[in-house]
């Protein structure tokens, strides 16, 4: 049985590192939304970034990435996969974000993560990444529209927690 996309949230790598660092607001977010029946998901690029950081990143990120990789299943965070065609679509979308200066040149993976989240039909990407949170919302929606992809909104976990109150 497929998960209901309205009850799914995608997480980016930064949030996994925040969880591994045991930041209270990250733990509160995970626990609260899972209690409310949300499925927390990570895409292929997040998995690759986590693997790379845990083996090649600088400290303390390497330690946190290793811890996150070990705890993903304990935290009940599930990866999703995409087809080769979907991966190509994600790469083209990330290129378009770069072309429109919506993400910095060294943040190509942020574009991939946004596209992968869209292709998985998950409407929100939960992140603490300033690059993602600072993207012009209207320009991002237009970019999704131009690519014929479902829009995804990057949102900080604290903002989601506040929305519950």
Task: Pin down the residues of each PLM region.
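Short, well-structured N-terminal submotif of metal-dependent ribonuclease cores
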Residues: 1-68
């Amino acid at each position: 049985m497929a998960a209901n996309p309205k009850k799914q949230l995608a997480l980016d790598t930064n949030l996994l590192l925040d969880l591994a660092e045991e930041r209270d607001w990250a733990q509160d977010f995970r626990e609260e939304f899972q209690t409310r029946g949300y499925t927390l998901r990570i895409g292929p690029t997040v998995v690759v970034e986590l693997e790379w950081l845990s083996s090649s990143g600088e400290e303390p990120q390497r330690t946190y990435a290793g811890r996150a990789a070990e705890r993903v299943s304990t935290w009940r965070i599930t990866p999703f996969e995409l087809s080769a065609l979907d991966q190509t679509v994600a790469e083209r979308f990330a290129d378009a974000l770069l072309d429109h200066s919506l993400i910095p040149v060294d943040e190509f993976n942020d574009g991939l993560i946004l596209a992968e989240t869209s292709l998985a039909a998950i409407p929100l990407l939960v992140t603490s990444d300033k690059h993602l949170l600072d993207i012009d919302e209207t320009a991002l929606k237009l970019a999704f529209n131009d690519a014929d992809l479902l829009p995804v909104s990057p949102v900080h976990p604290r903002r989601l927690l506040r929305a519950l109150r």
